[in-house]
Amino acid sequence: MGRYRVMIVEDDPIVAEDIRIKLGRMGYEVVALAATGRQAVSKAREHRPDIVLMDIRLGAEMTGIEAAAELKENYQIPVIFLTAYTDEDTLAKAKLTEPYGYLVKPFNDRELKSCLEIALYRQASDRKISENRQWLETTLNSIGDAVIATDENGRVSFMNPVAEMLTGWKEADAAGKRIQAVFHI
């Protein structure tokens, strides 16, 4: 395992320190501790952690869920939520940020390590998929022939510039339309 950089966002300093010690023993580098959502965003911008362990309830100024949404949108940093709350409303709000994990307090070392390993593996997989998608799109856009891709239902999901010229449709306008509506043989 490489030395992954972790940021802990926890408003209880004793809990934060306990997690920091556990992570150090597991071989992770804790690059920052934050006690509020605003601090989390600021320190993430400064330290660029590989992953963030985020308490959901951080106070009224900015919740952990709001901070996680900002980290995802602006920095693409994955978040694992740490919480003592498992009610439906909290879980529904947390899911909107597409977290990489959800640990219910109190948790043991094995649960923490497993959740981190799975989240970091998923992050690496997501990054690879994104790189492959970008490479494929660049390749298809540079082909001199018209290329139109559809999903399993025959709806347009991609058109290169040559296909746009051939059909008279812009990719953004054709996306989601049935191929028969866009291209007539």
Name every feature range the model reports, one short phrase each:
Residues 4, 12-32:
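Two-component/phosphorelay signaling modules centered on CheY-like receiver
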Residues 17-18, 131-154, 161-165:
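PAS/LOV and related PAS-like sensory modules
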Residues 47-54, 58:
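Active-site beta3 strand of CheY-like receiver
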Residues 62-69, 73, 80, 86-104:
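Alpha4 helix (beta4-alpha4-beta5 surface) of REC/receiver domains from two-component response regulators
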Residues 163-174:
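PAS/PAS-like sensory domain cap-loop motif
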Residues 173-185:
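PAS-family sensory/regulatory domains
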